[in-house]
Regions:
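One-carbon transfer enzymes
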Residues: 1-191
């Protein structure tokens, strides 16, 4: 399992561990909340909207995944079948020799990634044949990052969802296995 460290990523790890043995877990430190890597300085309003979105997303995740006592991801019981093989890394170290060595010692049957930066071929080649990515957007329309911001910005909230696809060297480009969109309810906001 290779995930980011945001509450939604930790939640997935906890849910998977309740049904499967997680033999190893690489956690990429994504910071408190993701800021777009592109510079939108030519559009001050877009910059402001992005800042509002990321703050609201962070608060919504905290409220749902941490403050809600029925789902609390900070409880050690939530990760019942996660082995002690856990390594944390930065974006810079995600494709490093230390991560390669860690993965080499695991021998997983399947690999799942969610919420991380791009893995290079040196890491992809170490993973088992059965490897999948959970992408926080509806591919191929919303690839890359901040994929829950853009559908609303483009007035397509029905395109907010997740895609599970085979993990390949092409960014969010492997064959799609499943997609799911959110249920729209009158009065809901983006968060």
């Amino acid at each position: 399992l290779i995930t980011g460290n945001h509450p939604r990523h930790l939640y997935l790890a906890g849910i998977l561990s309740q049904f499967h043995d997680v033999v190893g877990w690489v956690i990429e430190d994504r910071g408190e909340f993701l800021r777009p890597e592109s510079n939108y300085s030519e559009d001050a309003l877009l910059n402001e909207l992005c800042a509002i979105h990321f703050k609201a997303r962070y608060l919504a995740e905290k409220r749902f995944f941490i403050d809600d006592s029925t789902i609390n991801i900070t409880s050690s019981n939530f990760y019942s079948n996660v082995s002690k093989n856990i390594i944390r890394c930065s974006k810079k170290d995600l494709n490093s020799l230390s991560i390669s060595n860690f993965i080499n010692g695991l021998y997983p049957d399947i690999a799942i990634t969610y919420g991380i930066h791009i893995l290079d071929n040196s890491i992809l080649n170490l993973l088992p044949i059965e490897k999948y990515n959970i992408h926080g957007g509806i591919s191929p329309w919303y690839r890359g990052s901040i994929t829950h911001f853009w559908p609303s910005y483009m007035l397509e909230p029905q395109m907010t969802g997740l895609t599970m696809h085979r993990l390949t060297a092409v960014l969010d480009g492997g064959p799609i296995l499943h997609q799911n969109t959110g249920i729209l309810v009158r009065g809901d906001g983006l968060h």
